[in-house]
Design a protein with these regions (language model features):
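C-terminal, active-site-flanking charged/polar segments
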Residues: 70-74, 131, 135-136, 183, ...
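Short, exposed beta-strand-loop hairpins at the edges of beta-sheets
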Residues: 751-753
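Extended, hydrophobic interaction surfaces within ordered domains
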Residues: 250-253, 257-317
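M16 family metallopeptidases and their MPP-like homologs
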Residues: 1-25, 47-53, 103-124, 144-200, ...
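A conditional alpha-helix N-cap/helix-loop micro-motif detector
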Residues: 28-32, 268, 514-518
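Conserved short beta-strand edge segments in small beta-sheet-based binding/regulatory domains
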Residues: 464-469, 565-566
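His/Glu-rich zincin catalytic helix
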Residues: 36-41, 45-151, 188, 290-418, ...
């Protein structure tokens, strides 16, 4: 798909004939002299860079680099790098893409514009230009989405994205999907009508400000970047981008601040000239993307051109978006913290009992490098057992609708995300087997609003109109109307074998979708996000305790918890239920190329001591290396394969391990034999001393680096406390010390426990 789109952008250029590496014929048949010539032609000093970042003596390192690399001879008459652009377009281009792998029909429109020269890319003007283009693309997307949402468009979905094509072009790409039985020419009306309205009337200041928030998220400018929290890879990235594309060579934290300032300062007057640049003056490529079986529905070139002319001859109307204002005031009387305790085993964490019965676990993080400044998790004691079990599949679909759309105080989730007072605050809802939750993060200046948002999500929830639910149902029903692929049927059969027809192993079928209405959606929300079912909060922040207590009293202790509760079902969570040794295989109809996917699952139990958990990591690492060496390197049978295990501390050591690989149908039996031999030999003989020490070295290094990286994440700090309280996972375990104590015999024994009880092998082939 991406290659096909790139070929449309580069029509007539060398890129459409082959990749940079060459054609398949060249790759398969090159001579030794040719590859050496290629190496000397392009792998030369003037096209290379050495980037070193770390705790080093810079002068000493520079001298070392000079001594090691200075004797490499400079290239004589070096071959200049050439730029291969597409021929200049003489008017709009019309080129369809008909491909049997496509599962949709869409109108694609490409706007192609020159990319800024290298010498411009390190300037503020470059970033301003980039952000304005993104602002316009986001405004167009939001306008089209609103028309689809309100039923004013005959499209199923529509989006416009701005991206760079290999530093040759800026491309704005529309992707507009038609409804199943709709007239595809209506998509031309939709696209061209929005384009003309944009050209004639431009954009509003409110639209620009809302789009800035989306642009800020796209480029991660909403995430704090403090100088003290920068990592080596941040500096490497800046240096790499400067060398490869000419981007600004600036301290990452400083650059982050500059980029935020540039985006903030963009005005309506800055944006106005770009409307013509993008929507009128760019090269335009029109393409229908479709599967051959739908070719009869695709409009002809003549009909497409004629419809474009008709729409552009019509009178356009303003199409500005309007934005609701939201009141974040919480009107309930302030509550109190009635009891405080230190949490045993967790330094810096306290348990507060509130006057409404809610529990709060507060963790003070005294490190300004940890970002963002606040992580707030709200858990409710509901989960799947609080759903109506006789309408379980419908309830799951209602949950999907809630997660995607639920807001508060008359605003949907999408609208909330565009409001300045909510900018920089992340908010998501989740319904799972054990709980429902609200997950929020915020910078310090928006922390109070984050608490308000959490409270209002509980006390004043809002679901959009039934029309939005119907659109979501229509999309789901359309996808369900397609013939079920063999791979999907195989996956469903495997699910049944693995979980033993668990009552929660249900498909959301057409009957389940039809069974969802707004009454059910509202019922599911009230069942799941229900303080009366038990409400526990986890808060981690570098704000002072006095401030956090104030917010908790004003916004959390105020939440009424005396509402109605439902009688929860007593269904146990889904866990693997297969016993003994089982094999399930199926052959399906070939979709593209023949292949076989083999999955070997193990279900067992390992006592979750620190040493055993460390030994599990050794098993995963060493067995993965053995499998890679034999099945990928020696057999050439797959691209990737690994042994991966999970041990539940909460469930007293219940374990799952899995090996999955994709290969050719004629080879899988040999590879399964290899897999059997490797696992059997490892469980009987264990690792060699060399394997053990290599694994130990890598695991200690990975743990040290991973721990340091995760320690800079406030949500990670908070989730550690949550996992300790809810799942019994001790964050204070010294994994490095545990790795240091593991012996070869420990690894062998744990490997036997992981793989020695219940084994399921599933094999799916398409040929």
């Amino acid at each position: 798909m991406f290659t096909a789109q790139t070929n449309l952008v580069y029509q007539g250029a060398k890129q459409t004939k082959r990749t940079v590496l060459g054609s398949l014929d060249v790759i398969n048949n090159f001579k030794r002299e040719e590859i050496l010539d290629f190496y000397h032609k392009w792998y030369r000093p003037d096209l290379q860079a050495i980037i070193v970042v770390g705790d080093i003596d810079a002068a000493q390192m520079e001298n070392k680099i000079r001594s090691q690399f200075s004797d490499i001879p400079k290239a004589v008459n070096p071959t200049p790098k050439e730029v291969y652009l597409a021929p200049k377009a003489n008017g709009p281009i019309f080129e369809n893409l008909i491909d049997s792998t496509l599962s949709f029909t869409a109108l694609k429109v490409f706007y192609r514009m020159p990319y800024p020269a290298r010498e411009v890319r390190s300037t503020e003007a470059f970033y301003k230009d980039l952000y304005i283009r993104d602002i316009l693309a986001n405004i167009m997307t939001e306008r089209m989405k609103e028309q689809v949402r309100t039923g004013k468009a005959d499209a199923k979905s529509a989006v416009m994205v701005n991206y760079a094509e290999s530093s040759d072009y800026y491309v704005d790409l529309y992707t507009i999907l038609g409804k199943k039985d709709g007239n595809l020419l209506d998509l031309i009306d939709f696209y061209a009508g929005n384009e003309k309205s944009m050209i004639e009337y431009g954009v509003s200041q409110d639209e620009i400000e809302a789009a800035k928030m989306l642009v800020r998220k796209r480029y991660h400018l909403d995430r704090p970047k403090k100088a003290e929290s920068l990592r080596n890879e941040d500096f490497v990235g800046v240096c790499h981008n400067n060398f490869v594309s000419g981007a600004a060579l600036t301290d990452p934290a400083t650059l982050h601040g500059i980029q935020n300032r540039i985006l903030k300062d963009i005005s309506l007057e800055d944006v106005k000239p770009y409307v013509a640049k993008v929507f009128s003056e760019s090269d335009k490529i029109y393409s229908w993307f479709a599967n051959p079986k739908d070719l009869a529905k695709v409009p002809s070139l003549e009909d497409t051109k004629a419809r474009l002319d008709q729409v552009r001859a019509r009178e356009a109307k303003p199409n500005f978006l309007t934005f609701n204002k939201i009141d974040l005031t919480v009107n309930y009387p302030e509550g109190t913290i009635v009891k405080e305790n230190n949490v045993k085993g967790l330094d810096g964490t306290k348990e507060w009992i509130l006057s409404n019965g809610a529990k709060v676990y507060w963790t003070a993080v005294k490190d300004s490098k940890v970002t963002p400044d606040l992580s707030l998790l709200v858990y409710f004691g509901s989960g799947y057992n609080a759903l109506p079990q006789d309408r379980f599949a419908s309830s799951l679909f209602a949950g999907e609708f809630i997660r995607a759309n639920a807001g508060f105080r008359g605003a949907t989730a999408d609208e909330i995300g565009k409001m300045p007072e909510c900018g920089g605050i992340s908010r998501s809802l989740r319904i799972s087997d054990r709980f429902a939750g609200i997950f929020t993060t915020a910078p310090a200046k928006k922390a109070e609003n984050a608490f308000r948002i959490a409270a209002l999500t509980v006390t004043d929830p809002f679901l959009p109109q039934a029309k939005v639910l119907q659109q979501m149902k229509d999309k789901k029903l359309e996808s369900l109307s397609e013939p079920k692929k063999d791979a999907v049927r195989f996956s469903e059969a495997c699910d049944s074998i693995i979980y033993g027809n668990h009552p929660w192993s249900v498909d959301i079928d057409s009957a389940a979708v039809d069974g969802v209405d707004m009454d059910l959606a509202e019922e599911i929300y009230s069942r799941e996000f229900n303080p009366a079912a038990g409400m526990t909060l986890f808060i981690a922040s570098n704000l002072d305790e006095t401030t956090i207590k104030e917010y908790v009293r004003k916004y959390i202790a105020t939440i009424p918890t005396d509402g109605k509760t439902v009688t929860k079902a007593k269904v146990r969570e889904r866990i693997p239920a297969f016993k003994g040794t089982q094999v399930y295989s199926m052959t399906g109809k070939k979709e593209i190329n023949p292949y076989t996917i083999v999955t070997r699952m193990f279900s067992s139990k390992v006592k979750p001591t620190p040493k055993n958990l460390a030994a599990v990591d050794f098993v995963d690492y060493i067995l993965s290396q053995r499998l890679l060496n034999q099945i990928r390197e020696n057999r050439g049978g797959t691209y990737t394969i690994r042994f991966n295990s999970y041990v539940s501390v909460r469930e007293k050591g219940r374990s799952e391990s899995e090996i999955t690989f994709k290969t050719r149908p004629d080879l899988y039996e040999v590879l399964v034999g290899d897999l059997d031999d490797i696992v059997s030999e490892f469980c009987s003989g264990g690792p060699s001393e060399k394997e053990l020490e290599e694994a130990r070295k890598w695991l200690i290094k990975n743990e040290t680096e991973s721990k340091a990286k995760k320690a800079m994440s406030m949500p990670h700090r908070n989730s550690q406390v949550m996992n300790y309280v809810r799942n019994g996972i001790n964050p204070n375990i010294d994994r490095v010390a545990a790795y240091g104590s593991v012996t070869a015999e420990d690894v062998r024994k744990v490997a036997g426990k992981l793989t020695g009880k219940n084994v399921l092998t599933t094999i799916y082939t398409e040929e």
